[in-house]
Structure formats: C-alpha cells, structure tokens
Amino acid sequence: MLVVLLVLTAGVSCSDDEELLAGNGIADAAWSAENQVEIEGGVLNYTFAAAGDWTARSSADWCEVQTGSGMAGESLLRLKVAKNTRAEARSATITVSVWGYASPVSFVVKQGKGLSEQGDGKYRSVNEWVAGYMKSRYLWNRAIENVPLDYSLCYDFFFSSILDGVAAQDDVNREDGHWQGQKRMYYYSRLESDAPLSRTPGEAYVGSGIYLLDATRLGDDYIGIVVMVVIPGTPAAEAGLVRGDFITAVNGEEVTESNYQSLGQAVYDGAVDVTVNSVTWTDNGTTPVLTPKGNVQLGSAPFTSPAIYMDKVVEIEESDKKAGYLLYMGFDVDYDEELIAAFDRFRAQNVTDLILDLRYNNGGDVLSSTVLGTLIAGEAYKGQLYAHMTFNEDRTEAGESGDYKIGVKETFESVYEPIERALQHALGLKKIYVLVSETTASASEMVINGLRGLDIEVNLIGMPTNGKNVGMEGVVRSFHNYDFLLFPVSFYIENAKGFRDYSDGFTPDVQIDDSAIYPGEFGTMMDQLGYLALQWIKTDNKPQLPSAMHTRGSCRSMRSFGDLWENRPVQPVGGAVMQPVREE
C-alpha cells in the first residue's frame, strides 16, 4: 500500500511539471524593457493582460510594488518610486509571474542620480507649479525627465536649473536663447515675480523720456553723448530734443570717457540742464561741424512708452511715389487700434510703398503681429495662413497645434476682433521694406517670415536679425501674496510654406552696420537705413554699397566708446507671446 501511494504521489508531481505552459502568460504590456523614471519619483501605472492569476515583486525598496497580485484578465501594475536623493543613478528589476506559466517577465526601472536639497524650501510650492507647467508645455519637455530637481531652491535658481539641465543634454534646447558664436548669452524662457525686471510698451516710467543714448567721439575734436531715440510725448520731446542731437555737457560738466556713465544716467533720469548741439558734415561727410542749440532744461515726469513712435508719409522726389514710414517699437494689443489708425492715415494719403522700421522692436504679442500682417497684406490674402505654431512632441502627438490667419479673428488663443477689422484698413501691398538689426526679434521676425510665406516681397536693410523662431505661452499664478509670471518657450513659428529655420536670423538684402554712422532723424534721407530704403523705392533697384559700408559707414563716422544700452529705462520684454492665462 505504501509503495502504491509513493508511486501515485510521484505521478502527480511529474504531471504538474508537465502541465506548465510555455511562455509567460502576459500580453499587451505597457512597460518597456527599460523604463526611465524622474528623479523626484512618483507613481508608475502599467497595464497588461494576464492569462491567469499573477504576482509581482521588486528588487529594490525604493521602487515599491503597490499591486502585488491580481487575477486573470485586464490588469494594472502600480509602482511607487521614491525620490532619489543620492549622488548616483539606480535601477530596480520588476518581476511578474503568471500561475501555470513557465517563464516570469522582468523589466527594469531606472532613475537618474539625485541630489541633496540645498535650499530652505520657502518656494517649494512655486517650484512644483513651475516644474509641472514646464513638463507639460516646454518645447523640449521630455528632456526634463533627466534633470535632477531640487524643489528647495529659490524659484529663480530652480527655474535656471531646469533650463541648464536640459541644455546639458547636448543643447537640445539650443533655440531657447540668443547665441554669440558658441556662447549662449541668455535664455528666452523667463520666470518673473512681482519685482519688475522688465516692462512692455504702455507701462509707466519716470524720467526724461529718452529711449537710447550713445557715448561717442566725432573726429578728433568732439566727445559727447548722442541722442539716438526720443519717446514721443515726454519731457525730452517737449524740450525739442531729436535723434542726432549731440550733448557735450550735463549741468555744466563736460562729457568725458570717465564720466559718461554717470552723466548718461542723469540724462535718462531728467531734471538736468544739458548743452545741446546739432551736427552737420562737410568735406563729403568726413568733417563734423557742431552748431550750438543752447542749454536745454530737461525735465523729469511719468511717461509711457507707446508701440508707435512715429508714422509719417514721405513723398519721393522726382517720382509719383509716396512711402509710409512706421517706427514700430513693440507689438502690444493695447496699441492695435493706434496701429490701425496709422494705416488709415497712410491710405488717406495714397501711399504706394511702406517702410517698416523694426530696428528696436524685439517682439511682443502674436495677436498684434497678425494685425500688422493683415494691415500689410489685405483682402487678397484673407483666410491664408500667416503663422502656424508647432508644440512639443507630446502635444503634437495629441493633435494640438495653433494657426493665425490673415483677416481671421478666430485664433488658437482667442477670438480677436482687430484682426478681422484690420482688413478694412489694409494697404494690400505686394512688397515692403523693413529696417532691421540684431534687436529685431520674435514677433518682428514673425512678420518677415509670415509675409514671405504669402509670397509678399520683404526687402530687408540693416544687420542680421536676432533669430528667434520660437514663442511662448504665458501663465500667471499667485503664491505668498505675489504674482509669478512664467513664460517658457513652447512653440515653433512656421509660415504658410512650413519654413521656420531662421534661428540664425534673417540676412538683409542690403547689409550695413549703421552703428558707426552718425544718426539722422527717422524717416528722412539723413537716416542711413531710411535713405537706402527711399532710394530703393525711387529707383526700383536694390542699392549697391561700397564694400567698406557693408560693415561700417565710410562717412558721417562716429566712434562709440561707451555703452549706455543697459542703462536705458525702457527695456521691453519682447518675444513672440500669447496672452498669459491666470491660474487659480
């Protein structure tokens, strides 16, 4: 009897082994052989189909299996991954076994090296919000998964750590920023608190109302500060200062190479007495002649910087042509009605051509750029694509994109009536002339690219543009009784032909650096770039410059020795931005 029982027992055991099925009994698994998890950890959910009851286990405590078993059918494997605070990367092996099947399934969860917290944690909630938005909206969002994030840092350092961490991955976010050679000078993406780091057109300032000064030498005899741009409606404008005025003394103190910074700042601030001269040139533009305009009391007062500094009509001598000239300083929806009114004035005087001066325009609202594009193109282009926005891979795969069309008020971000209304005030041009510089960026370059996509001829005069072919969606949220404004680069800007490869800037048709040429009044033959545009319009032929003038002027020469660019009170935000959304 005992022998029989042993034989039967052995038979049952051998039968169980023979009944194990080949394979693993798992289908449609959502995991990969290797799965990267973010440094700060989180929960991973993987779906799969099991042919029988199953169990799962992890080789590491930091990667906890929360659903350790389940029944046959559609199943969910949930893993809870801890934040990595260690200075080395780590991995865990997850094994899933299905009852009745011979082979378990294993896969690996990897986590990059972490870091210990370095801050006081005061802005942790701000940083968590920033990280969430960046992971969703940033144009190179997938690279953030590989960046160790220390949420304890101050918000500005935390934001920089994200951008720098993505850049460390072979500069995948190269187009987020302005470069000089192989050096990134700054990022376009920005995070600001209530502290006013920069301002947009229309915001209030206090001072004289001079937009830009330049410390320079004229010939061998004169040294001073030249007025480059005056803001309309300000104390400087009311005092009669114009572009090209030469200041040789401030409050009786003569300008020198050692005091130009302090005197220049005093002129920006106002409430000073300045000695002003006009400058003319003899000997074929090689010898400067100063004519005193006297001492001018330069006041100081609150002022705003409008989007339009000048619009005028220039009659072209010895022709029947008229050119509209527009000195446009920033794309701002608050000034779109004034922009439309300026084009009405152009239409009323029957202009045949347009000179668009974007030398100092570093961008602004995408909606305003579309209004300007419509005012130039007109009814013949109604409904045609002006700009197409391409978002990050995740949003693109989800079918998300954004379009802006000539004369169509329905846009990706909102319904904006001025775009449609602009059709009734448009010039309907097939060709325009644009004055450009390295400052010309974003929404300004969007005009150039958008019109060229419609086969409108855009002739550029000046220096290569900034090369900002990306834009930003903004979001505002309040923390600790402060507003935080986040503008990450979140889309590429393409035209109707799908072209977006202008990160190195647009090269001018007539390239000339006018920074060493003494400035003349805007919209006149005394302004070097304006002169070239007017000559081009008059002759219908592109101006041919002596080779020396492609880089530096050969007449009316000035030698700048001091940079007063960073001192200027008006420093527009720029960009190609969608209107920010407030989150609660």
Predicted regions and their residues:
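Bacterial Sec-dependent N-terminal signal peptides
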Residues: 6-34, 99-124
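Solvent-exposed, low-complexity, repeat-rich "mucin-like" stalks and linkers
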Residues: 18-20, 25-58
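Surface-exposed binding patches on compact interaction domains or structured appendages
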Residues: 49-78
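Short, surface-exposed loop/turn segments at beta-strand-coil junctions that are enriched for proline
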Residues: 82-88
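Surface-exposed loop/turn motifs at beta-strand-loop junctions within extracellular Ig-like
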Residues: 83, 98-100, 278-280
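A short beta-strand micro-motif common to beta-rich folds, especially ectodomain repeats
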Residues: 88-100
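Flexible, low-complexity junctional segments that flank or bridge functional domains
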Residues: 115-354, 368, 378, 552-584
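C-terminal "post-core" interaction segments
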Residues: 323-326, 330-341, 345-353, 362-584
